[in-house]
């Protein structure tokens, strides 16, 4: 696919893309929640709403990764998602990547909440918004600097040509 081997994306570029992605996901989440509320027309279904939101965000990522190999934020920061053979990953691999990117930040959010509750430091719960940054911890231990979910699935983020 590339004349030369793709350049791995720097942590700085991935962080910038992630922050921009968070802004875009606010819009995706808003529209998904609005549609849910209009379709269901009843409150009291928080688990169903969270599932709907999880699916909407997943659809956003999967469609973009499959169609172009990148989301709008990734395109802005010139990032592309590739597999081991420098091609766009297969749909099953993309789905697995989406599912595996959640456990680490969710575990960190849960741990942070437990510490806040145990120490009666409720303001500490505000730091939960920073738990997606926990995705960067494994990059310091991977020889290629990949996220844990990318290492497990066999994908990587590279600088787009």
Regions found by a protein language model. Give the residues of each.
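Membrane-interfacial and juxtamembrane segments of integral membrane proteins
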Residues: 1-161
């Amino acid at each position: 696919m590339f004349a030369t081997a793709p350049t791995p994306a720097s942590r700085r570029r991935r962080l910038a893309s992630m922050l921009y992605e968070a802004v875009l996901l606010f819009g995706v989440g808003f529209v998904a929640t609005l549609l849910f509320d209009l379709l269901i027309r009843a409150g009291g279904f928080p688990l169903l709403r969270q599932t709907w939101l999880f699916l909407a965000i997943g659809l956003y990522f999967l469609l973009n990764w499959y169609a172009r190999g990148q989301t709008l934020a990734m395109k802005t920061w010139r990032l592309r998602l590739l597999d081991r053979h420098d091609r766009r990953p297969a749909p099953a691999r993309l789905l697995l990547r989406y599912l595996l990117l959640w456990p680490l930040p969710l575990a960190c959010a849960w741990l942070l909440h437990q510490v806040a509750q145990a120490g009666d430091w409720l303001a500490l719960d505000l730091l939960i918004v920073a738990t997606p940054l926990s995705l960067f911890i494994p990059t310091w231990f991977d020889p290629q600097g990949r996220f844990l979910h990318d290492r497990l699935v066999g994908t990587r983020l590279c600088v787009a040509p």
